[in-house]
């Protein structure tokens, strides 16, 4: 135990962990909001993964939590399961979290099977195309919220989906009664009565869900970009642009304080205390998140089975993301990480986070670099980052719920710009034709088809 925990650098670990936790806070909120599960899910993921991946992992200075690639893939999985559940997030949630749990367990298994050492052999064009594709996805999907547009609040679009909404309600009534055996002629009156009792409010609620789902993802964002431009909410746009301006501008003044945090605090405070009319992020409950027992009881395997492959992809992506960051940490600290132990730690962190409703994550490069530069030296630094984020959940959930959605959209725009692999794009003219084709194919498939299959196709092409 003495070797496992080294308290001789505790002062430095505390400072490094707190600083990394501060950097992680706005990103966690933004990734949670982007995913579709709400800002709280990002915060829960950041806290649990940071603590447990550090406790059980194999990279002493690694700071883990939701990352851009993991969130982009999670967003696709969440949207797919919600759509399969006819837009009912309460029905979909146990299956979404079950996929996240499965991904974590796969990572643990990968660690025990000593597969961590082989991740580094993935060809660079595949990784480059995928990372740039992730950046493009984030940029495209954040255009509507930056403009203050939400398809689920577009009255004309909701009106358009009203007939379809009524059809879905009728389908559910018929399905329920077929299961109950109420399809004989004598009992058919009950079906007619239930159908005639459908209210306009019920139709409206169903149409809102349909409109909201139609605007999600890359294709949904592109489909309604014209409507977004015609219905710009100037307040949201100003808040997003001001956030972007501060993030890039404050870095020129000093890097001692994270510019993302400065933007979050300054713009959110100005909007709140200025009494501005802005759209809030989803509410963040104060107190410890509840354990989701529904993962064991609320699973429909017919709906979930197509997403099992997604769990493998999520596990593989998290492994790549984490171990690449581990290499960065090694170069900075002149140490050697343990790749298989790191996968076990990441898997445990993701599994526990999922049981409490958190987004999956991985080793985060920027947060890890900040931790090292701020003095972090041992696994205690990552655990301290997790403790800091837990304190935010316990004490400041209500305050964090006042953050404008436009601010998080602005933060995500800068994340999308930052995650793209410009080195790979600049090297394209000098690459061999085979590498160019692989990089561009993975990039296009990542953005417009399926993240789940993009890397697999790239690996097959590179073989």
What is each model feature region?
Residues 1-463:
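Transmembrane helical cores of multi-pass ion-transport proteins
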């Amino acid at each position: 135990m003495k070797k496992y925990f080294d308290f001789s650098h505790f002062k430095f670990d505390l400072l490094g962990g707190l600083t990394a936790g501060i950097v992680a806070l706005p990103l966690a909120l933004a990734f949670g909001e982007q995913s579709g599960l709400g800002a709280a899910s990002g915060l829960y993921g950041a806290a649990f993964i940071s603590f447990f991946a550090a406790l059980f992992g194999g990279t002493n200075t690694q700071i883990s939590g939701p990352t851009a690639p993991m969130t982009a893939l999670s967003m696709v999985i969440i949207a797919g399961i919600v759509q399969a559940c006819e837009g009912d997030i309460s029905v979909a949630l146990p299956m979404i979290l079950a996929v996240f749990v499965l991904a974590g367990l796969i990572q643990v298994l990968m660690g025990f099977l000593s597969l961590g050492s082989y991740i580094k052999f993935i060809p660079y064009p595949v990784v480059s195309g995928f990372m740039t594709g992730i950046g493009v996805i984030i940029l495209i999907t954040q255009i509507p919220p930056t403009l203050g547009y939400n398809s689920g609040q577009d009255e004309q679009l909701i009106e358009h989906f009203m007939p379809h909404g009524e059809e879905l309600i009728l389908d559910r009534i018929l399905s329920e009664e077929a299961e109950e055996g109420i399809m004989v002629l004598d009992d058919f009156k009950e079906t007619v009565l239930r159908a005639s009792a459908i209210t306009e409010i019920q139709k409206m609620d169903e149409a809102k869900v349909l409109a909201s789902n139609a605007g999600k993802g890359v294709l949904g964002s592109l489909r309604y970009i014209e409507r977004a431009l015609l219905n710009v909410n100037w307040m949201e746009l100003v808040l997003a642009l001001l956030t972007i301006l501060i993030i890039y501008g404050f870095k020129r003044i000093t890097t001692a304080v994270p510019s993302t945090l400065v933007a979050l605090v300054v713009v959110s405070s100005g909007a709140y205390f200025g009494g501005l009319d802005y759209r809030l992020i989803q509410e963040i409950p104060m107190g410890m998140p509840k354990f989701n027992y529904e993962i064991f009881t609320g699973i429909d395997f017919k709906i979930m089975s197509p997403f099992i492959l997604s769990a493998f992809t999520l596990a593989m992506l998290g492994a790549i993301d984490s171990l690449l960051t581990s290499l960065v940490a090694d170069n900075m600290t002149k140490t050697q990480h343990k790749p298989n132990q790191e996968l076990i730690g990441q898997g445990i962190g993701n599994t526990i986070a999922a049981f409490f409703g958190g987004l999956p994550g991985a080793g985060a490069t920027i947060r890890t670099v900040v931790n090292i530069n701020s003095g972090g030296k041992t696994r205690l630094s990552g655990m301290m980052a997790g403790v800091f984020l837990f304190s935010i959940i316990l004490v400041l959930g209500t305050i964090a719920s006042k953050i404008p959605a436009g601010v998080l959209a602005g933060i995500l725009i800068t994340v999308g710009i930052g995650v793209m692999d410009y080195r790979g794009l600049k090297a394209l003219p000098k690459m061999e034709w085979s590498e160019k084709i692989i990089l561009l194919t993975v990039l296009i498939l990542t953005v417009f088809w399926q993240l789940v299959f993009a890397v697999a196709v790239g690996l097959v092409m590179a073989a």
